[in-house]
From Swiss-Prot:
<dbReference type="GO" id="GO:0005524">
    <property type="term" value="F:ATP binding"/>
</dbReference>
<dbReference type="GO" id="GO:0016776">
    <property type="term" value="F:phosphotransferase activity, phosphate group as acceptor"/>
</dbReference>
<keyword id="KW-0418">Kinase</keyword>
<protein>
    <recommendedName>
        <fullName>Putative phosphoenolpyruvate synthase regulatory protein</fullName>
        <ecNumber>2.7.11.33</ecNumber>
        <ecNumber>2.7.4.28</ecNumber>
    </recommendedName>
</protein>
<dbReference type="InterPro" id="IPR026530">
    <property type="entry name" value="PSRP"/>
</dbReference>
<comment type="similarity">
    <text>Belongs to the pyruvate, phosphate/water dikinase regulatory protein family. PSRP subfamily.</text>
</comment>
<dbReference type="GO" id="GO:0043531">
    <property type="term" value="F:ADP binding"/>
</dbReference>
<keyword id="KW-0808">Transferase</keyword>
<keyword id="KW-0723">Serine/threonine-protein kinase</keyword>
<comment type="function">
    <text>Bifunctional serine/threonine kinase and phosphorylase involved in the regulation of the phosphoenolpyruvate synthase (PEPS) by catalyzing its phosphorylation/dephosphorylation.</text>
</comment>
<dbReference type="InterPro" id="IPR005177">
    <property type="entry name" value="Kinase-pyrophosphorylase"/>
</dbReference>
<dbReference type="GO" id="GO:0004674">
    <property type="term" value="F:protein serine/threonine kinase activity"/>
</dbReference>
<feature type="binding site">
    <location>
        <begin position="148"/>
        <end position="155"/>
    </location>
    <ligand>
        <name>ADP</name>
    </ligand>
</feature>
<keyword id="KW-0547">Nucleotide-binding</keyword>
<dbReference type="Pfam" id="PF03618">
    <property type="entry name" value="Kinase-PPPase"/>
</dbReference>
């Protein structure tokens, strides 16, 4: 199997994100290796050995996506037998020309500690404290309240929005015992109607997810899944709650669709 490396003298998050996005367009399997904080010659020498071993093991030069500020370290990595792609070099010159300003590369600037980092930490703590309807007295502080039946992806989506964008997300489970038969929002949520966003998915997918947790139970049965989803979607429509069907989407895609529909402010950079 061919190797793909994501290497940097910083976090390697930028190289990894660009590299994965690019390689996802090709029907080729790769062995992925991310190597962050390669910030001295000794580490670069070890990485070079790893790359050369990958060439030997696979019989093909690995693809190397890198973002180095240190030119000497970059030169070392590009001379190790891989096919290198430097995203920063590719774009810096035309951006410098457009802005009329020379770039001042600095490690850890992209993903360092700054104001928006604190937004993300606060949002993560909020998501953990307000998972599954735990603290209804804090809903006024939410930027967004995700609702849906059990196991529709509310928790991972809440945490992803917090970690990536610094958005405070609470989530509240809708259960057939309390809410569906009346087809109205729980009283705790009514005053926050403008913050609500619903999640749903196919009954088959919900059945599969619940069966992994409680196989053979009424909770996981296809009939129960169909009932809950039909009722909650009727509730969304009646109460004018925006929602998406997340059956075929990753958590990243779900988050992106929510942001597109809600226009929430992102605190990423």
């Amino acid at each position: 199997m061919r190797y793909a490396f994501y290497i940097s003298d910083g976090t390697a998050l930028t190289a990894e994100a660009f590299g994965h996005a690019l390689l996802s367009m090709f029907p080729v399997n790769f062995e992925h290796k991310t190597l962050p904080f390669i910030d001295n010659q000794e580490k670069a020498n070890e990485v070079c050995k790893t790359i050369k071993k990958a060439v030997s093991d696979s019989g093909e030069p690995p693809l190397i996506f890198h973002t180095f500020v240190n030119e000497k370290l970059k030169a070392k990595i590009t001379d190790c037998g891989g096919i290198c792609y430097d995203f920063l070099d590719h774009f810096i010159a035309p951006v410098e020309k457009e802005l009329g300003v020379k770039a001042e590369p600095k490690t850890h600037r992209t993903h360092g500690v700054h104001k928006n980092y604190n937004f993300r930490i606060d949002a993560i703590n909020y998501a953990l404290d307000n998972d599954d309807g735990k603290r209804l007295n804090q809903l006024d502080k939410a930027d967004l309240i995700l609702i849906g039946v059990s196991r529709t992806g509310k928790t991972p989506t809440s945490l992803y929005l917090a970690m990536q964008y610094g958005i405070k997300v609470a989530n509240y489970p809708l259960t057939d015992d309390d809410d569906f038969e009346r087809l109205q929002l729980p009283k705790e949520l009514k005053q926050y109607r403008h913050k609500l966003f619903g999640l749903t998915l196919s009954s088959q997918r919900l059945h599969e997810i619940r069966s992994q947790r409680r196989e053979g139970s009424q909770y996981a049965s296809m009939a129960q899944c169909r009932f809950e989803l039909a009722e909650v979607e009727r509730l969304y429509s009646r109460e004018a709650v925006p929602f998406i069907n997340s059956t075929h989407y990753s958590v990243e895609e779900i988050a992106a669709k929510i942001l597109a529909k809600t226009n929430l402010e992102r605190h990423r950079y």
